[in-house]
Amino acid sequence: MMGHPPKESILDLLKASTARLLTSGICSARLDAHVLMSSVLGCDHAWLIGHGNEVFPHYLCEEYEGLIKRRELREPVAYLTGIREFWSIPFGVTPDTLIPRPDSETLVETALKTMPKNTEKIIDLGTGTGCLLLSLLHERDTLQGVGIDISRGAVAVAEKNARTLGMLERAEFHVGSWGVRTTLIAGGPFDVVISNPPYIPELEIEDLAPDIRWFEPNHALNGGGDGLDAYRLISKALP
């Protein structure tokens, strides 16, 4: 395993993995090594630190090595573990979905502050993992919502997240385009429309980090020539 003796401690293996990821130009090397090992061992960060002198289980060496190799090639940690936390909620992610970002939590905060208390139904355009819609439903148990995404794979992920979180009775997801006005009619009427559409100008995609431009879905990043294509489509589709 990694060119080291078979009976390697958890701490030594973490140090070796961190060094490899740093050599690959990954700034978050230490954190990534810890997250991937926690995923393999099924433990949290505190457990790793407290048991650092224990021998890493031999039967898990191949799995951990495989994840480190994939991370060296810049595959995002969230795709490797299949999980990304958003709004303190663990969401399943796959390469069919954009990885939820912490700064997108401001959309949830703003919606909660501005939505009237009597809001009953919301629609999320470009739902991806469903993180925006499901986070809002998590905060307000009287809400119902519909998520729309052009990707069948993303819709499947969002539905699975809703099921895991026990929200499938209040949330439904459909394949569709946010530029079609009928999208806003089916399942409506809606009190609130939420969306975090792609906003990166097409020519700037190549300037993104390899982790993003090589692995995350282009349609969820590419906002067209000026980054505003999706916004124009949505504004035309709104009642």
Predicted regions and their residues:
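Conserved hydrophobic residues forming the short capping helix/wall of the S-adenosyl-L-methionine
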Residues: 21, 162, 238
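A general structural signal for well-ordered alpha-helical segments in protein cores
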Residues: 14, 33-34, 64-65, 77, ...
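Conserved SAM/SAH cofactor-binding pocket of Class I
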Residues: 102-207
